């Protein structure tokens, strides 16, 4: 998953 996409969904994923 792309960090940018995760942030858009409201998820905080590093990497």
Curated annotation (Swiss-Prot):
Q: Name one GO molecular function term.
A: rRNA binding
Share what the entry says about its subunit structure, partners included.
Answer: Part of the ribosomal stalk of the 50S ribosomal subunit. Interacts with L10 and the large rRNA to form the base of the stalk. L10 forms an elongated spine to which L12 dimers bind in a sequential fashion forming a multimeric L10(L12)X complex.
Q: Which Cys-Cys disulphide bridges does the record give?
A: none
Q: Which GO terms describe its cellular component?
A: ribonucleoprotein complex; ribosome
The encoding gene is: rplK
Q: What is this protein called?
A: Large ribosomal subunit protein uL11
Q: Which family does it belong to?
A: Belongs to the universal ribosomal protein uL11 family.
What does this protein's UniProt record list under function? Answer: Forms part of the ribosomal stalk which helps the ribosome interact with GTP-bound translation factors.
Q: Keywords for this entry?
A: Methylation, Ribonucleoprotein, Ribosomal protein, RNA-binding, rRNA-binding
How is it modified post-translationally?
One or more lysine residues are methylated.
Is Ribonucleoprotein set as a keyword in this record? yes
Query: Could you tell me which species this protein originates from?
Result: Kitasatospora aureofaciens
